[in-house]
Amino acid sequence: NKKIEAKINLDRIVSRHLGILAMTGMGKSNLVSLITKKISEVKGTVIIFDYHNDYTTLNIPNVNVIDAKINPRLLEADQFSEVLEIRENADVQQRVLRMSFTQEVKEAGEFWNKLEYEVDLLVNSEDKKLKEIRTSAYRVQDIIEDAQRRFDDILDPEIGNPMDYIKEGCTNIINISELSEKQANVAMGFYLQQLLKDRKNATIAKHGKSKKEKDYKFFEPVFIILEEAHVFIPKDHDTAAKYWAA
């Protein structure tokens, strides 16, 4: 019955969590597109994490498509380990990466060269305490070399802060379809963490509680859409995206 109207209060949906649940083919993407279009009409800011490359051709004004990249300089060691796909139970390899992934590496002009150099120091160390991790250090060397080849279009230490590519008042579609599930989770967690921090700073400034110069990007609420949210916010275990989305 086309005479039955269904209306959505945009102010309410941008101020709380919203789940769009339905079986395959029942119109979830169409509803997302419609909501996005309506928010776009009032110059709102939308961010869609597009896991299946479904929204990059969205036909609405002010669409900003971003191919998701990860700047390893901005990650913590455990996040970088996930992106490099070091196994969770490879404790010694994880330790090698933590020891090598120093602040000096993050700030180095030649990121990969400096990281490889730090791992190489562990491989060739004469310290008896470090000899026991030598085999794992060799393996981490291989993983880092392999990652530069396999993830060349994903890992980019020269891109700066990915947040700079998001535009206020636009529909920002972050294409994460080329990332593995773990990589997408790390990237999503990073964006969500930064967005939460940004909105907190904006809220404090809006109520006149901060004397600092403007240190936020979005003065108005941001509507974030996580496609396949059950993958990144699972019920049975914790993830970076789950933590920051909560």
Describe each model-derived feature in a short phrase:
Residues V65-I70, E85-I86, S177-Q183, H230-A241:
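Flexible beta-alpha connector loops of hexameric P-loop NTPases
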Residues N59-I60, A68-N172:
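Helical/strand "switch-coupling" subdomains that flank nucleotide/phosphate-binding cores, especially
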Residues K2-I70, A241-A245:
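Glycine-rich phosphate-binding loop of nucleotide-binding enzymes
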Residues V65, F80-L84, G189-K197:
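Conserved NTP-binding/hydrolysis module of P-loop NTPases
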Residues Q183-A246:
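Conserved P-loop NTPase motor cores
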Residues N1-K2, N185:
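Charged, amphipathic alpha-helical linker segments immediately N-terminal to NTP-binding catalytic cores
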Residues K43-I47, E168-T171, F219-F223:
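Loop/turn-to-beta-strand initiation segments
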